[in-house]
């Protein structure tokens, strides 16, 4: 009986995808979006996903129409597979090097209540919870660089919050599509932690070289970042261990960990004592853009610490 139900769901999903393709006669990328986010719960259609990314790269003006096509796909489905694939498709844009994605702002759809009417103990209940957690992270990630006037430390604080959101996304069994989504999640954890490391190292370097004058509020913010990283680091290692237990292959502990040197610790300690004396001055803080955050350390530092966690 179960096998028949599973077969029926697959046939039903294939029919829905076919009907959507028939009506998608306006743009060729619309068909690619439908194929990339099909009802097939095994894996993403990488061929069509890559086509969409290449299409945006070569036709930047297609970015918004493609986002609209994905939004329509989300709004017309109650299927967790389709919803998750739409989120993964958008998430992949952040890895693709398409700078336009940083201007997306809040996601143009809302999955925070996806499947809430169903019991968490229903057949799809746990998958609906997974979709909601993934959406909450991605909605926060999409506005990371939206405010161009944020200072470096404010961006780092937002990044730490995003890491918290990522750790709320937990693998469910060994469902292939969920494991694939978890690999996206782990890649994001590593990427964001790399930005945190380089951003904070760049901040300390500027302070040490007297290139940056900070206020006492910013000194407090820096110390809060340190405290948060200390507590977050332990949670991250446990999270990675948990994910490995479900077969998430890229959830490996990093062997080389970026450490704050003794001289940098001295700088941190001095911040709280020196900063109040600088409050009367205008802080010489330059807003940091998305591109700046990726390139805040020298090439030598980047090669020595590719994507590691910040520890103290």
Swiss-Prot record:
Keyword Membrane: yes
Entry keyword Transcription regulation: no
Recorded GO MF terms: phospholipid binding
Keyword field: Coated pit, Cytoplasmic vesicle, Endocytosis, Golgi apparatus, Membrane
GO CC list: clathrin-coated pit; clathrin-coated vesicle; Golgi apparatus
Major localization listed first in the record, in broad terms: membrane
Residue stretches making up the ENTH domain: 21-152
Record localization: Membrane, Clathrin-coated pit; Golgi apparatus; Cytoplasmic vesicle, Clathrin-coated vesicle
Matching SUPFAM superfamilies: ENTH/VHS domain (SSF48464), GAT-like domain (SSF89009)
Cystine connections: none
Cross-referenced InterPro entries: ANTH_dom, ANTH_N_plant, AP180-like, ENTH, ENTH_VHS
Pfam (any one): ANTH
GO terms, biological process: clathrin coat assembly; clathrin-dependent endocytosis
Protein name: Putative clathrin assembly protein At2g01920
Upper taxonomic lineage: Eukaryota, Viridiplantae, Streptophyta, Embryophyta, Tracheophyta
